């Protein structure tokens, strides 16, 4: 067992909640104690949904453990059916209730309800949230899609028909991605049969078999179900994720191939501004920027390709917290000449960010906190996220409009507009000088402690009695290295968002060579050394 302040994924029953909450006419009865009942908080506060999630808890207490908790569960199932009248129910246990082994599936079956009741076996101590969402959706599809049968040929003249699989509640920009992809498919002349889980009913899952093929937007949730539909009904499914201009064009070509139609109407009129913007913006702010990427596999891989191939960034880190897709992330990292980071420990991610010294961090809510602590620009590109990443505006990550949103997301944190003449103009300004630090970091100063002490002394009233000097405490740390005036002046010519790294590297270089004074020559030697 590991104690932590942060986890990238919850237990698997949270994934089941995401699927149940996304659908209509489905109810989830969860065998859980007091304390595991926080679904309302997740979906109404963080995602800002206007309805409570369809989840009923047994909420047994400590004193209930001395009597029949199985009877409590049966009562909760019967009461939920009588009150909500769902088309279907799923039943399971939370991570805590799993320990008492009450068999929710068998207990619900014994009630002989007049609706489908699908039991979920979600091993809370081996698997996590995304696996739980995938397993829940797979079980629902397997139970409700009907008996396996070969797919009939499409009638002449009928529009191609597809299902869109993967979007869930609490998903990162799933609502807006769905709008964008439906628009793309409509432009291609492809009709959408069912979208699931988001917005689907159990009856809709019975119509999945009618489609010609499936569009998988989020493999973490939908790949298992898509594999089953391919085996049971002969429905192929897409492998390309439409993130970025290149990814979207490949997606359109793949979908057109599955549907047997011409992709030209969409490819010729894509209208994305990302390609031109990335060519027209001053390359000083784009080409070669060092970027660290971490998130779920779908977004980490897709946006890594956008950053490297469409914006000219240099990828110095790529990782995921989802071990189910570690192979794909490792393959993508190898294509960029780096080693993938596969971990669900945020401290490992923070250590990797420190070691890589990137100029931009793209990650989850936790990487936002880490980057702020380290003074590095950051943008959120993957779940888990907090309330501010469920915006009221339209902000997809997929499709051609998603590529426009990604351009803004990736470029704006890099302090656009700070051309060299502006840096020179404001370098010594008392209000806007570079020692103030970026405004988005809450006024964090990048000045040295000596500078701050000098400024504090200048602000103190003249008649203030001198404060006694504190007794020095000796710490075992490298002695500070002195800088010559010429070297300090040259250092100030470096833009402030990379100056800290240049100072650190130069001082490390000088200490390793026992140089008491950093001169102009030392600065250039250090630059050449680390450049190699």
Swiss-Prot record:
Component of the dark-operative protochlorophyllide reductase (DPOR) that uses Mg-ATP and reduced ferredoxin to reduce ring D of protochlorophyllide (Pchlide) to form chlorophyllide a (Chlide). This reaction is light-independent. The NB-protein (BchN-BchB) is the catalytic component of the complex. Keywords: 4Fe-4S, ATP-binding, Bacteriochlorophyll biosynthesis, Chlorophyll biosynthesis, Iron, Iron-sulfur, Metal-binding, Nucleotide-binding, Oxidoreductase, Photosynthesis. Its cofactor is [4Fe-4S] cluster. Belongs to the ChlB/BchB/BchZ family. This is Light-independent protochlorophyllide reductase subunit B. One of its GO terms (molecular function) is ATP binding. It comes from the Bacteria. Protochlorophyllide reductase is composed of three subunits; BchL, BchN and BchB. Forms a heterotetramer of two BchB and two BchN subunits. It holds the Pfam family Oxidored_nitro. It comes from Methylobacterium radiotolerans (strain ATCC 27329 / DSM 1819 / JCM 2831 / NBRC 15690 / NCIMB 10815 / 0-1).
